[in-house]
Amino acid sequence: MTASTQEARLANPDFCQGIQYFAEKLPEFEKYGKQAAIAQGRTAISDPQLPDAVYQTLLAADALRYLTLQITASKASGHPGGFASQAEAYAALVMLGHKNIITEVGHHAPGFYSAMFLDRSLEDMGIVNVQQLRDRYREQHGLLGHLSGFIPGILAPAGPLGQGQHFAMSAAKLHRDKLFPFTVGDGGLGEPYIVSSMAHFHTAYPDVTNFLPVLVWNGFSQEHHSMVSTKSDAEMISYWQGNGFEEVVLVNAKDFDDENQPGDYVDSTAFSFDKRLEFTQAVLAAADKAASSALGGKLTVLIIKQLKGAGVHARGAKSHNLYAMHTLDNADIVNALKTRALTPQAWELVRTNFERAGGGAAGRTAVTESILELSELGELGLEEYPVGGEPKVATTAMGKLVGKVGQSDRNFIVTNADGNEASGIANINQALKIIHPTPDDLYNQNPSGQVYEPLSEDACAGLAVGLSLMGSRTLWCSYESFAINGLPIMQTVTQAMAELRRPTPSVITLFTAGALEQGRNGWTHQRPEIEAYYAAMMRNGNIFPVFPPDANSIQTCYEWALTTQNKGIVITASKSPLPIRLTFEQSRQAIKDGAIALQESGGSKTVVFAVVGDMVLMPVFEAATYLEAQEVGVKIVSVVNPRRLYRPTDVAWDSCSEPDGEFLDDAGFESLFGGDALIGVTAGASGMLEPIMLRSNAKRDTFAWKRGETTASPAQLMALNGLTAENLVKRAMELIG
């Protein structure tokens, strides 16, 4: 039975404004709902076996379902079904006092928003009642379509499936005294990264077990049965045990079904009320056991097996998302909301428990809401090499600084799936040691090392960027050709950083072993196209690809990167010895301005070469010699920080929470790139040259990477891509002719 909003409004708490349906009464409320199960001054229920704790956990689960469905239906948009199938598990964790809850499933967003509303976190966004919750759901500057860095109390920027585990593991590493549960959908369990990344992490950090995957095993993915829907309970338990989990805690709703529902997956909201309480008690006990196990040093997983869409408008994959007809007037929506309706008194009780749990609103108590204190780095010990002196390996020069950072900051880690030795940065391993349970001096291995080297780009990128998001310094290193497998999680995190409510150390990466250094390895190792992705991301506002031309400039690039916040800084450099072209002072100016002239000569007409990269400078300098012999003026400009070369209106910098609005002005641009002809040169993606090509008014052209091939030398590979002095001279003469 329900009462209309108008009839009930006088007796309703203010926060209930906007709730469409209320129950007239609830079974057993007078017996188990007299006072909040989480007492005043406490942060959790005292005993998960107490009947009032179980009863109020059930109320909380239904409150989450109701809000999830009502806010999604208010926009006929969003995903209620997945979260609904694990509402009891989420409610149980909150009642047990755990507020640092993360998700691997972006589609669980409306459920998480509902939880943040109930514990009053969303008041920091001006959302104080359900009507405002409805109004601002899936709206700009409101409750974004998927979880992000913008919402108080939640730091789970769930991008593509297979990412949320990184945030939980990162937070667990930094905060050993707290539990970090994270929900995982069984549809997403098909992603290879979820379990493998946890296995890698557990090998490296066997004592860090205070993260808790909560598998939402509901039998369905987005549009069909999940690929693990045919597994038995025993098979699922064996799966997790086979992947190193010591404790597997599973609750199957089917074991409590008294309505003879068909199939292996059932809806607990269809049970009799007594059986609903039994099921909720089992989930609460399981959550308590799993939490204690994870905090006690065992790698643990909690599994709740319940039909997708339990308690909402549809069941199975049909409950995954709403369609245009699923408005608040839709019969299925109305029936589900009326069935899940609570009394005003029950709403007040749920809200009180959620607010008290964990010591207050997640927006005030979650570890992600505060700035992590960082160690002082002191002097980095930069070493300036003489311009024109002996060629040096840029990555090795940077590696020395990285070692110093790690020695000063024990939370700092370096990750690299390809191996630091192969990237010219063996000195990082020597200084910081590879994390491995087997000590071995030959390989610089030590269980307490700071270099994380599983052979998985996702695991490496995920831990590095996850720790940065949580407030710690890191460095992700990779071969340029293989970094693509870690790029999705990096993009997710840097996008979250752009809207994060606090400053945090920038994501810093080092990509090396570029295409020109991989001739013998062939095209499988020659994939500079990743630069096109970062070129596009430069317009986001907080992405800064940098291309130091030598061993001096790479040191100043890293020095600068360490001072920044909420950015994604991608350092791309060769691992081969190359000429020293810039002083430290010049290098720092290049970072500030975006580029710097390496060579300039006069002539009747001037050709400007705008060069992105280090090794590709060689044919450009050779071309300059030929052009100068023909009395053509030549200027060679090294493009070090192309993001600075855009116009302010090209980039969404002013929408970033830590805005960086420094751009080279028109006079500075003309001073660097003004001439009779302009040729952009890169051994990577031509998109990196876009800022220059947009602003130049000269006759211009671009030389860029085309495709890979097996070759005996960098020069041969450049020739295959048209990057030769002969071609550059020919085109220059055509442009000025």
What kind of region is each of these model predictions?
Residues 2-78, 122-158, 351-372, 380-387:
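Conserved internal helical-beta-strand scaffold that buttresses enzyme catalytic cores
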Residues 49, 57, 64-69, 74, ...:
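Cofactor-binding active-site loop characterized by glycine-rich and histidine/acidic residues
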Residues 133-212, 281-285, 420-533, ...:
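Thiamine diphosphate
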Residues 49-53, 69-77, 98-99, 150-156, ...:
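Glycine- and acidic
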Residues 86, 112, 166-168, 233, ...:
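Short, highly selective alpha-helical patches that border small-molecule cofactor pockets
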Residues 57-60, 101, 352-505, 587-596, ...:
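Non-catalytic terminal/interface segments that mediate subunit docking, oligomerization
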